[in-house]
């Protein structure tokens, strides 16, 4: 437990507290009055209101669209089901910058819909909501569908035999069993959309600003640290509350249900109604998920005079006008891969130790630490990144000019995925096997190597894959700490989109396509090696 606690204390809590302190202290004295001053400003109230409203709207829309998909994946067996499950999960591991870029290519000026029907939705709230549904569709499908597939359908059939109608049986038997999973999925979707940054920044334009975008604007553009500090505290409180409720729903789901093998519940769709439902879900996946990704690829190949790889070839040289890149954009790929590999190793060590500690200990303190491990997914990455710059600049942690700063920030986001993936698998390992190895003379290290490691190896690979994918796409903190001569892929895409010109736009599409393909390949590989009990993600 000591290593994970120290890691989070130094590289998460310390930078965040330092930023808040820098903003709310004057001459060493806390200025609590600044909180009321900031929260009473009409512009800040507008940001808070829009952040909450769009998160609630995104959550409701995601549930409405994704719950039929959860049922189809849980109860139907059809050709290509595993591949389709991997496809719908791809958006979840995509960087938000790529998601924003894909929807910009679909809905923006000169985009697919603009050319097809003269319709533009960029800089509208609909673009933000649709992108959020695209991003979080898999959260509902996997969380709710994963539980739904393990519910014994004979219980609902028994209710119908006793006289209940189809809907009444579902409402009285299945819905109460699913409610904790639906609540957990809704809370996670709310968390991800409440803290949305890249999607809103790219698609929302100046008219729309969430808390995360406003923290970035107040910090990086206006240098108004008091306002940024107050907004960080508000976001921290909201995220903490959401995670506390989420932890309660997960415990309730684990404790209250008797589950069966998913292979026993999936059947071929029968009748016109079930086939229509399957067709509707397939159409939703095609339009909502595959179309934006396909348009992104097409726009990366759409060069003057036809289609070709001109934008990809242009990535090999630095910007001739000077100002966007000090190096060729293509080098961002190599930088990102290096950073992500180091971040993955860090996340595996810290997250693996944390999961092992949580498995072998119990109590309210341990449950609290489990919830704290999820905070980096919700607390402002912008705050963490800026906090790195102002705290890790003195011995013995003078890291501001070193390359390790980026992997450390990325690992913070990877650790929760490692913990959530490893924890159920480690809890399923029979401790008596380890005890027997110890009795036979094996040291604790050898017992772990000979007993635990073979049982959790596949889950460890899945955790590594998730950590690699999310590290590769981390943007909020990296945009602050990545050096101009060592940009990552998401930072390079954002810089290109920030400049006018057909070449810059095309290069942004090309880089986004490369990043999408790397993340998709990682996800498809994970689906092939994924064990049945490899966690919530």
Where do the PLM segments sit?
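Transmembrane alpha-helices
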Residues: 2-7, 60, 90, 94, ...
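N-terminal signal-anchor/first transmembrane alpha helix
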Residues: 1-18, 82-88, 236, 240-244, ...
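Transmembrane-helix boundary motif in ABC transporter permease subunits
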Residues: 34, 56-88, 101, 155, ...
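Membrane-interfacial helix termini and adjacent extracytoplasmic/periplasmic loops
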Residues: 32-37, 45, 80-81, 100-133, ...
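Interhelical loop and adjacent transmembrane-helix boundary motif
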Residues: 32, 37-43, 194-240, 270-274, ...
């Amino acid at each position: 437990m000591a290593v994970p606690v120290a890691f989070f204390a130094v590289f998460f809590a310390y930078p965040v507290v330092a930023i808040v302190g820098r903003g709310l202290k004057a001459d060493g004295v806390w200025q609590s009055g600044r909180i009321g001053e900031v929260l009473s400003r009409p512009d800040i109230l507008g940001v808070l209101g829009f952040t909450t409203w769009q998160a609630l709207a995104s959550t409701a829309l995601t549930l409405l669209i994704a719950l039929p998909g959860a049922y189809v994946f849980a109860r139907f067996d059809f050709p290509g089901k595993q591949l389709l499950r991997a496809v719908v999960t791809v958006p979840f591991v995509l960087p938000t910058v790529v998601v924003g870029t894909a929807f910009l290519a679909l809905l923006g000026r000169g985009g697919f819909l603009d050319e097809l029907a003269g319709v533009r939705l960029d800089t509208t709230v609909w673009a933000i909501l649709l992108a959020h549904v695209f991003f979080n569709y898999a959260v509902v499908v996997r969380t709710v569908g994963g539980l739904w597939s393990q519910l014994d359908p004979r219980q609902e059939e028994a209710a119908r035999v006793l006289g209940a109608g189809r809907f009444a049986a579902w409402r009285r038997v299945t819905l109460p069993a699913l409610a904790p999973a639906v609540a957990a999925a809704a809370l996670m979707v709310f968390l991800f959309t409440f803290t949305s940054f890249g999607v809103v920044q790219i698609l929302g334009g100046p008219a729309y600003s969430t808390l995360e975008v406003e923290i970035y604007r107040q910090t990086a553009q206006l240098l108004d640290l008091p306002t940024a500090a107050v907004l960080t505290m508000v976001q921290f409180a909201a995220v903490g509350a959401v995670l506390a409720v989420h932890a309660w729903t997960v415990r309730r789901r684990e404790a209250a249900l008797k589950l069966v093998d998913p292979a026993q519940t999936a059947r071929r769709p029968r009748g016109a109604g079930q086939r229509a439902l399957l067709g509707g879900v397939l159409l939703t996946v095609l339009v909502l998920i595959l179309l934006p990704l396909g348009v992104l690829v097409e726009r990366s190949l759409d060069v003057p005079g036809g289609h070709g790889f001109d934008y990809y070839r242009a990535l090999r040289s630095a910007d001739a006008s000077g100002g966007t890149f000090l190096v060729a954009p293509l080098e961002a790929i190599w930088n990102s891969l290096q950073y992500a590999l180091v971040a993955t190793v860090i996340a595996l060590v810290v997250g693996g130790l944390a999961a092992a500690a949580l498995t072998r200990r119990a109590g309210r303190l341990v449950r609290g630490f489990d919830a704290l491990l999820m905070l980096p997914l919700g607390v402002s990455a912008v705050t963490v990144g800026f906090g790195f710059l102002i705290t890790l600049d003195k011995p013995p942690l003078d890291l501001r000019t070193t390359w390790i700063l980026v992997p450390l920030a990325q690992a913070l986001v990877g650790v929760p995925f490692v913990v959530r993936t490893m924890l159920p698998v480690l809890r399923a390992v029979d401790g008596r096997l380890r005890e027997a190895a110890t009795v036979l003379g094996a040291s604790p290290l050898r017992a772990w190597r000979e007993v635990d490691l073979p049982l959790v190896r596949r889950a460890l690979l899945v955790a590594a894959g998730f950590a690699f994918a999310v590290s590769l796409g981390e943007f909020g903190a990296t945009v602050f700490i990545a050096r101009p001569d060592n940009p990552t892929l998401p930072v390079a895409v954002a810089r290109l989109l920030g400049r006018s010109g057909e070449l810059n736009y095309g290069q942004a599409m090309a880089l986004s396509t490369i990043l999408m393909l790397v993340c998709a390949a990682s996800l498809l590989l994970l689906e092939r090696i994924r064990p049945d009990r490899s966690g919530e993600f």
